[in-house]
Design a protein with these regions (language model features):
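Transmembrane helix-loop-helix hairpins at membrane boundaries of multipass inner-membrane proteins
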Residues: 2-27, 45-199, 274-290, 348-350, ...
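Membrane-entry segments of alpha-helical transmembrane domains in multi-pass membrane proteins
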Residues: 19-34, 49-57, 154-172, 210-223, ...
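N-terminal signal-anchor/start-transfer transmembrane helix
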Residues: 32-46, 178, 307, 311
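Alpha-helical transmembrane segments
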Residues: 37-43, 179-182, 379-381, 521, ...
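Hydrophobic alpha-helical membrane-insertion segments
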Residues: 60-78, 258-267, 463-475, 554-577, ...
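Aromatic-capped, Gly/Pro-kinked transmembrane alpha-helices
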Residues: 114, 121-164, 571-612, 630-770
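Hydrophobic transmembrane alpha-helices and their helix-loop junctions in integral membrane proteins
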Residues: 179-223, 229-550, 561-567
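Hydrophobic alpha-helical membrane-embedded segments
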Residues: 426, 516-525, 615-641, 645
């Protein structure tokens, strides 16, 4: 860090903080509550309604969107007015203090003492405040909670945490969810479980919104699992077909692997920090109240959860198979719910990851490595997919790799900004693919598509816009967020840049390669889907036709957002004049300026890097366009690849193509080797244990019990018990017979003598004893 940057960082420390307030922020719990309520209304009354419950879901999520927008406005107002609440106590006091400090003291003291609480956003606030006469002020998150129960001195609380990150996600989730709801009314019209679909769509949205607002890690776990359960239900919506139910089960089980890491990591954080609160845990991590080794172990465990939920390499295999669900569900999963939950969790607990992986001043960590490898590996897999939804699925895996990589290099704002922009253009692409499939009744680009631009002009135009945004080409949204990630790697001194949290050269190189791959495989998608000749079957319905308004209007809205979203965080220096209201606005409102957020450094923008990455991306477009639009089209407008291409000529290329087609053999590894390889021996061992062990013991116990019963019956019951009873009976019988023989002889005088004797004896006994 040079002296100028160090001075700016030191001067940026906010000396005061204000508590954000406002009715909408404090009652943000209504936002997830509304779709949760609609879930129950649809279940109980949906089938009786005119639109089979869809009206409940759409109304609820629309109201949630209105509340989310109000929260966004209220939060922006709080941040903008924060510095106006406090006048500077003395003019330029902080600046004079540091101007009098020697360069050596500045290097030794300012770096170690102020970096713990400063951030790049704080620099911006100070810079603005320096001119206006106000000092930088931190805006604390709105936290509303109540004690659920208390035991052993530990309080279990439930509440909400609302800050810039939360309100941004509330807006994204509600916007995408509302458009998906509207789109679905046409797409799944006439479905055999139409009401069931909308019920779980509402619950899915509510679960993600609950997760976003979680104030503590217990709520985070609950929201995390609810999102997983809803995705399982919706991926397997058409469960009668075995591939669909298998895909749902695969998604569920794969995520269980990562969830074990989530539980272990959260337990470690609770016992280390002594609190469930996300704020308390982050503060403890940042202030070194938790040991480095403990933070590292917790970070590794939580990273395992990110691998499964966000579809990162080696646990990404479930995500392409999840395309078995309805296309609107795929859009919601990939743009605003399931997979971005992993990114959000890292962003929310960033103090833990930043300190645990020692991101500042480093050049390597697990997050950066996983993200870098995933974005390139998934990009290569997208090349060989014929199913348009699977191409987009691997594209999502790749783009999530960008976000994970950005978080790994300390580019927090860049990662979250890319999550924001990606939500709009990826939702647009999935819904666009659904529009095409709705017309041709297939997702196979090679067999069922081609030339679709002539039949579906609106879908084509919106798909092109969202594709350019995904490619990261200027001036659309993806360009600004992707290049901010590349800047954040800090490994680009070659391009004249400064700053960053370390020198992550490998991440930078992989990020640039990933940009070229994205452009190349999306060019292939554009050609196979919209150019050439139509290769599909009309199924007796005539030529394909454009979708209805309930499908195309959401596409238009998303394409507009794919254009404009990037301008919310323009880099400083991009425009001249009074443009501070447009420069880095996203980071200004979203990046926390509080004690629960670590001190991260932002790299300065480099137009050299931006131009270079754009040239590389355009090279990817050019190579793919030359192959498909010129070579393949020249062979035949109906062709989808060259008959005598590289894979037919070159053994190495063919082998590489086979590896990609087999998805790096990961499914083979998991299913055939690990699962089946374990299942056979384990099943045999379990059978032997059951037959020889458990059954043997049970059978032996049974035999011993039978022998014991026989002994008791023969020796005790028959001889002893029955013998005693029989003997007493025979004795009574003998006595009676003897008495009868002796006494009862028919002589009256003998009876009288006996009666007299008996009376005499009784009288004597009476006299003696009474």
């Amino acid at each position: 860090m040079n002296m100028t940057n160090l001075f700016t960082l030191a001067a940026a420390v906010p000396s005061k903080s204000v508590q954000a307030t406002g009715w909408f922020l404090e009652t943000a719990w209504l936002i997830p509550a509304l779709p949760a309520l609609s879930f129950f209304l649809i279940l109980f009354f949906g089938k009786k309604m005119k639109y089979k419950g869809a009206e409940f879901g759409i109304t609820a999520i629309a109201l949630s969107l209105i509340l989310a927008i109000c929260c966004v406005g209220q939060w922006m107002n709080q941040v903008d007015n924060a510095s106006d609440n406090y006048k500077k106590s003395s003019s330029y006091e902080t600046e004079e203090k540091y101007s009098e400090t020697s360069s050596q003291d500045l290097e030794e003291n300012a770096l170690t003492e102020t970096i713990e609480v400063a951030s790049a956003e704080q620099m911006n606030i100070y810079a603005a405040g320096d001119e206006s006469g106000y000092e930088p002020v931190a805006v604390d998150a709105v936290i509303e909670r109540f004690t659920w129960w208390e035991t052993g001195g530990k309080k279990f609380q439930v509440g909400i945490m609302v800050d810039g990150l939360a309100v941004m996600m509330l807006f994204v989730v509600t916007v995408i969810s509302l458009l998906v709801h509207i789109y679905s009314t046409d797409y799944v019209s006439g479905d055999r479980r139409y009401t069931h679909y909308f019920a779980f769509l509402s619950l899915f949205s509510a679960s993600m919104l609950f997760f976003v607002l979680s104030e503590n890690i217990l709520q985070t776990i609950v929201g995390w699992e609810l999102v997983g359960v809803c995705s399982f239900a919706l991926i397997g919506h058409w469960w009668e077909e075995k591939p669909n139910s298998d895909a749902a089960l695969k998604a569920f089980l794969t995520n269980r692997v990562g969830d074990m890491g989530l539980l272990v990591g959260m337990i470690i954080l609770f016992w280390s920090a002594g609190s469930w609160s996300i704020v308390d845990i982050n503060v403890a991590a940042i202030n070194n109240e938790i040991g480095q080794t403990t933070l590292l172990i917790a970070s590794l465990c939580l990273t395992a959860a990110v691998l499964s939920k966000a579809g990162q390499c080696i646990l990404h295999t479930w995500l392409p198979d999840a395309m078995a669900g309805p296309t609107p569900v795929s859009a919601l999963i990939h743009a605003a719910t399931m997979v971005v939950a992993g990114i959000y969790m890292v962003a929310r607990l960033y103090g833990v990851f930043f300190e645990g992986y020692d991101i500042a001043g480093s050049s390597f960590n697990v997050l950066a490595l996983v993200g870098s490898v995933t974005l390139v590996g998934a990009g290569l897999l997208a090349f060989v997919q014929d199913d348009i939804k699977k191409v987009l699925a691997y594209s999502t895996v790749s783009q999530l790799g960008y976000m994970v990589m950005a978080l790994g290099v300390g580019a927090w704002t860049a990662a979250v900004f890319h999550l924001f922009t990606h939500a709009f253009f990826k939702a647009g692409l999935f819904l666009g693919a659904g529009s095409v499939s709705h017309s041709v009744h297939s997702f196979d680009m090679k067999k069922s598509m081609g030339g679709m631009r002539k039949f579906m002009p609106t879908t084509y135009k919106t798909f092109i816009i969202c594709t350019i945004a995904l490619m990261g080409l200027p001036p659309l949204a993806g360009f600004w967020s992707k290049d901010e990630i590349l800047v954040g790697t800090g490994g680009w001194g070659l391009f004249g840049g400064t700053g960053g949290n370390g020198s992550y050269v490998f991440a930078l190189v992989m990020g640039i390669i990933g940009a070229a791959l994205t452009c190349a495989y999306m060019t292939r998608v554009i050609y196979l889907t919209f150019f050439g000749e139509f290769r599909g079957d009309t199924h007796g319905h005539g030529d394909p036709h454009e979708s209805g308004k309930r499908i195309t209007v959401p596409l238009i809205i998303l394409s507009v957002m794919a254009i404009g979203a990037g301008f919310l965080n323009l880099p400083v220096g991009f425009l001249t004049g009074n443009t501070t209201n447009w420069q880095e606005r996203f980071g200004h409102y979203v990046e926390p300026v509080a004690t629960y957020f670590p001190a991260i450094a932002h790299g300065t923008p480099s137009w050299t890097l931006a131009i270079f990455s754009t040239i590389v991306a355009l090279t990817g477009v050019g190579l793919a366009a030359h192959y498909f639009f010129i070579k393949v089209n020249a062979q035949s407008p109906a062709a989808t690849e060259l008959a005598n291409g590289l894979t037919a000529k070159n053994k190495l290329a063919k082998a590489g193509h086979t590896v990609l087609k087999q998805k790096y053999y990961l499914d083979h590894l998991y299913t055939d080797i690990i699962a089946n390889g374990t299942k056979g021996p384990v099943a045999d061992a379990a059978y032997w244990t059951n037959q020889k062990g458990i059954d043997g013991i049970v059978n032996q116990v049974g035999k011993q019990a039978a022998n014991s019963a026989t002994f008791v019956y023969e020796k005790i019951d028959q001889n002893l018990v029955d013998g005693a009873v029989n003997l007493s009976g025979k004795a009574s019988e003998g006595l009676g017979e003897t008495t009868r023989t002796i006494v009862q002889r028919g002589k009256v005088h003998q009876y009288a003598a006996i009666m007299f004797a008996a009376t005499t004896i009784l009288a004597g006994l009476f006299i003696v004893f009474v």
